[in-house]
Regions:
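A SIS-like phosphosugar-recognition module
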Residues: 401, 469-470
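Short acidic/histidine-rich active-site segments
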Residues: 463-468
Length: 544
């Protein structure tokens, strides 16, 4: 599919500023009682709101993401990235910053919606662990909020251009006027694809379908679903994870696909996450109809002991494995245990099965960021599915510093290099920060995404909860300075002055909140009688 954002009055894609004014003029001529409504105001407001619904956003961003996936298949240097956002304002500022620092472009830069952050920050129950205990409706609500703020970023940036255009016309600067109209015509939206975490579906396949619909209607083009038991779900980096048989998970994949197709988002993307590497338990024994089928393969990983009819106990669950009676190890929790050391094999089987049943991207949850560990599994998957590719969690749950310093330490030691100056267990200590080992580790961290995109098939690199940590860090720094000896200078020097020096748009916070947009709307609606907020006495004038 190929979906483009709407122009002002057409469904056929973006149109020029002038043609949209002309379209509005033609409409207004048919309505003689619409006094005081100007064609240019209508054109501007429509341009500022080029996505009318969440489904418009989902279709547009799905097409972008599909194009990015095809580009990556041809060139693995063209991987994509995202940062997890827990509030619309955070997403808005992220995209404004991206456009500022990267030539006005947002190419291959996405949003990520983390179930962990919704649980920790957005539940009405207060902070919760990542165990699917938060309200399921909070997920589509946050998606809608993220895109509301991104659409407002479009409106704000275009409004500033419109004001500059009016100024150029007033001054008779035709060259500047032409330049600004071209800028309007070439405007790139802040709206980008989102990969949204649906956890394990919050229930059965029907519950998954219903929630998927709400998420897509809110704007999600990509849904990430995991193979854990919904009511026993754990964070991917915690213990106690329990997986479900493949037929259960496949039903939820199909539920997501049906939701996309029902809503006309044919390009919708499904990301299937396997937690099998760290999950040693299953709630169910899979149904198997014949030897070697998917249920039999799942059950082959169960930790069993051979028994006979004579030593079987009352209440035992017994399976037939290659003609032998086997008793799976069952815990007091009524969960069944997998054989130790089978995690990678189960991840490979999970991934192949998901791709063969409608998944578009894989997600293998690992316990550490190690390229070769990921690559070895992907190599096995690609023997069956040659274009298999991953989304990968560059997780804050990893201690990146100690992991990579230990990787370098181990590599140096294996190569016969002298590591006597280093204590492997203490490499996190600050005294190692300026050492050659730390420098090499930092370089490996810097190139991790590019290296793993090339070696391990990672199409999308995300950080799940970076803005959770940046909020905590920046608040800690401000509290230390402001409530300490620095007083007000702690804010002025380290926040406001830095915003101004770095050109952070929020330095003019009234403008960011929509005050100028509101003033211009007042003028559209009331003409010269409009009472505006942005007059000579507005303190925002101090910021230029």
């Amino acid at each position: 599919m190929n979906y483009q954002p709407r122009g002002i009055s057409t469904l056929q894609g973006p149109a020029s500023y002038q043609s949209e004014i002309e379209a509005a003029q033609a409409l207004l001529k048919t309505q003689p009682t619409w006094n005081g409504v100007t064609a240019e105001a209508v054109a501007r407001m429509r341009l500022q709101n080029r996505f009318r619904t969440g489904l418009d956003i989902a279709r547009y961003t799905a097409a972008l993401m599909r194009a990015d996936m095809a580009a990556y298949d041809n060139d693995p240097t063209k991987y994509t990235q995202s940062l997890g956002c827990w509030h619309g304002f955070i997403a808005q500022q992220k995209l404004i910053s991206i456009k500022k620092h990267f030539g006005g472009r947002t190419d291959r830069k996405y949003l990520y919606l983390s179930g962990w952050m919704i649980a920790a920050l957005r539940s009405e129950f207060g902070p919760l662990p990542d165990q699917s205990m938060h309200e399921k409706t909070s997920v589509p609500a946050l998606i809608e909020e993220l895109y509301t703020f991104l659409r407002q970023a479009d409106a704000r940036e275009l409004n500033d251009i419109f004001r500059s255009l009016d100024k150029a016309r007033k001054e008779g600067d035709t060259a500047r006027e032409k330049e600004l109209i071209a800028k309007i015509d070439a405007f790139q939206t802040h709206v980008v694809p989102i990969i949204a975490d649906i956890d394990a579906g919050f229930g059965n396949a029907e519950a998954t379908y219903l929630l998927a619909k709400k998420m897509i209607e809110a704007g999600a083009c990509a849904l990430q679903i995991e193979n854990q038991v919904s009511d026993e779900k754990q964070c991917g980096h915690q213990d106690g994870k329990v997986t479900v048989p493949h037929e259960v998970f496949i039903a939820k994949i199909r539920a997501c696909r049906h939701a996309f197709l029902e809503l006309g988002v044919e390009d919708g993307i499904i990301v299937t996450r396997t937690d099998s590497l760290g999950a040693g338990l299953t709630q169910q024994i899979a149904v198997s109809h014949q030897p070697g089928d998917i249920g039999d393969q799942y059950n082959s990983f169960l930790d069993c002991e051979e028994i006979t009819a004579e030593n079987a106990k009352n209440g035992d669950v017994i399976i037939n494995r290659n003609g032998k009676l086997m008793r799976p190890k069952r815990l007091p929790s009524n969960l069944y245990q997998f054989r130790p050391g089978t995690g990678e094999d189960r991840c490979v089987l999970d991934s192949i099965t998901s791709l063969q049943n409608g998944a578009d991207l894989l997600w293998i949850e690992t316990e550490k960021p190690h390229i070769e560990q990921i690559a070895k599994m992907v190599d096995r998957i690609r023997k069956v599915i040659p274009n298999a590719k991953l989304a990968y969690n560059n997780s804050p749950s990893f201690n990146w510093t100690i992991n990579f310093r230990q990787q370098v330490y181990d590599a140096w030691k294996e190569a016969g290099k002298d590591v006597s100056k280093y204590s492997r267990a203490e490499l996190m200590k600050p005294e190692y920060d300026d050492t050659p080992l730390a420098a090499e580790a930092d370089e490996r961290i810097r190139t991790f995404q590019a290296d793993s995109a090339k070696r391990a098939g990672i199409f999308h690199h995300l950080i799940t909860l970076p803005t959770y940590h940046t909020a905590a860090l920046s608040t800690d720094n401000l509290a230390r300075e402001y409530f300490g000896e620095q007083g007000m200078l702690g804010y002025v020097k380290n926040v406001q002055r830095q915003e101004i020096r770095q050109g952070i748009a929020c330095a003019k916070h009234q403008n960011m909140a929509g005050s100028d947009i509101g003033d211009d709307h007042k003028e559209y609606f009331a003409g010269e009688a409009a009472l505006k907020a942005g007059g000579a006495h507005n303190t925002m004038n101090q910021f230029g």
